[in-house]
């Protein structure tokens, strides 16, 4: 995964609107079901579990087995009692970002509570180029992935505020090194928004992706 520095003030302006979900986490707690509540994250982000998932080979479908957090996407959100502000804010922010990035699909819009996590997995079921934005108010969280070159886990620690990373998540038809086994964990409220581009994009499509990345890094 490649870190992308966010310098574009227009993009930051849209992302800053999304901080509403962190600022209003009590609203989420009151109205939404928390996925993976009372799950101890330590097992699911451990080296032992990572090894188990890798050794499963293609028996691992690609999905994370478990995670803790609030899924905000309309097809994933689970209400305890409906609140119109939550989908309204999602629609507004998602639409602006999709237009800006020329993306067709919002893959993830997820809010993690303290001690929230995403278990080791590889997304082989949804191979694509991923543009991933993470907000952490204190930086006390991380994204970890298996580095095939060193055969070790590498952690990309969150920055205070917004950060971005970009990379290709491979499938089982690709070389092993294209499989990105990864997990995430946080000790504070944290959110991740991601958009995907076609894994089999044309040269023109890949050039467009690079233009998007350049735009994110432009002042």
In which residue ranges do the predicted regions lie?
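Catalytic core of non-heme Fe(II) oxygenases with the double-stranded beta-helix
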Residues: 102-175
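Hydrophobic, Leu/Ile/Phe/Ala-enriched alpha-helical segments that form helix-helix packing faces
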Residues: 18-26, 89-101, 184, 197, ...
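Compositionally biased, intrinsically disordered low-complexity segments
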Residues: 7-9, 25, 42, 56, ...
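Signature of the catalytic double-stranded beta-helix
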Residues: 31, 35-116, 122
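A residue-level signal for beta-strand positions that form part of recognition/binding surfaces
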Residues: 3, 106, 190
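Anionic coordination/interaction segments
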Residues: 1-16, 20-23, 27-42, 203
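Catalytic core of Fe(II)/2-oxoglutarate
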Residues: 144-219
């Amino acid at each position: 995964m490649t870190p992308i520095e966010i310098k574009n003030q227009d993009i930051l302006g849209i992302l800053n609107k999304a901080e509403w979900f962190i600022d209003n986490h009590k609203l989420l707690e009151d109205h939404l079901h928390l996925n993976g509540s009372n799950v101890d994250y330590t097992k699911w982000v451990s080296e032992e579990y990572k090894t188990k998932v890798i050794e499963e080979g293609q028996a691992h479908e690609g999905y994370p087995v478990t995670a803790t957090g609030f899924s905000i996407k309309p097809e994933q959100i689970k209400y305890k009692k409906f609140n119109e502000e939550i989908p309204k804010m999602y629609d507004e922010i998602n639409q602006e970002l999709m237009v800006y990035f020329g993306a067709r699909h919002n893959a993830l819009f997820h809010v993690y509570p303290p001690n929230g996590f995403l278990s080791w997995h590889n997304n082989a079921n949804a191979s694509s180029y991923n543009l991933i934005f993470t907000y952490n108010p204190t930086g006390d969280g991380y994204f970890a992935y298996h580095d095939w070159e060193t055969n070790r886990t590498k952690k990309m620690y969150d920055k205070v505020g917004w950060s971005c990373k970009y990379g290709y998540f491979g499938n089982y038809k690709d070389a092993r090194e294209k499989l990105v086994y990864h997990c995430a964990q946080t000790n504070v409220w944290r959110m991740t928004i991601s958009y995907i581009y076609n894994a089999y994009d044309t040269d023109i499509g890949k050039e467009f992706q690079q233009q998007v990345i350049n735009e994110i890094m432009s002042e």
